[in-house]
Amino acid sequence: MSWSGPLRGLNTSLTCGPALVPRLWATCSMATLNQMHRLGGPPKRPPQKLGPTEGRPQLKGVVLCTFTRKPKKPNSANRKCCRVRLSTGQEAVCFIPGEGHTLQEHQIVLVEGGRTQDLPGVKLTVVRGKYDCGHVQKK
């Protein structure tokens, strides 16, 4: 039995005996030493971009100030936000979800990733019910 025995049932263009061997080599591009020297080897994958939490699910932070922001064009509201100094040393603007909050300066909050769609530049959200940020009150 020849080496093309198992391939006998396939398309005849693939099983034309020795003609298959050069096609296998043609698909594999091999770099010369000169090309490797010029191009510097295989391309390196750039490091994965991490968000403001640097790959962590949540971060602790201290509230620096609270304020309201206006959303982008089709929406209209006053979104409650706060500037937080994270445990990594960075400062970030965070969205405070829910109705009513009692956050003040120097209070400790837990912050998670998750941007607010209509607030440009706000990529973090305060977790309600953890540390100094209370739960949303029932009506």
Swiss-Prot record:
The answer to whether UniProt assigns keyword Mitochondrion to this entry is yes
Kindly state a single biological-process term from the GO annotations of this entry: translation
- Give the main location: mitochondrion
Q: Where is the transit peptide?
A: 1-29
Any single GO molecular-function term of the entry would be: structural constituent of ribosome
Supply the alphabetized keyword list: Mitochondrion, Ribonucleoprotein, Ribosomal protein, Transit peptide
A Pfam match is Ribosom_S12_S23
Map out region (Disordered) in residue numbers.
36-56
Q: Quick one: a GO cellular component term?
A: mitochondrial small ribosomal subunit
Compartment list: Mitochondrion
Q: Which domain of life is it from?
A: Eukaryota
Q: Which family does it belong to?
A: Belongs to the universal ribosomal protein uS12 family.
Assembly information from the UniProt record: Component of the mitochondrial ribosome small subunit (28S) which comprises a 12S rRNA and about 30 distinct proteins.
| Name this polypeptide is given | Small ribosomal subunit protein uS12m
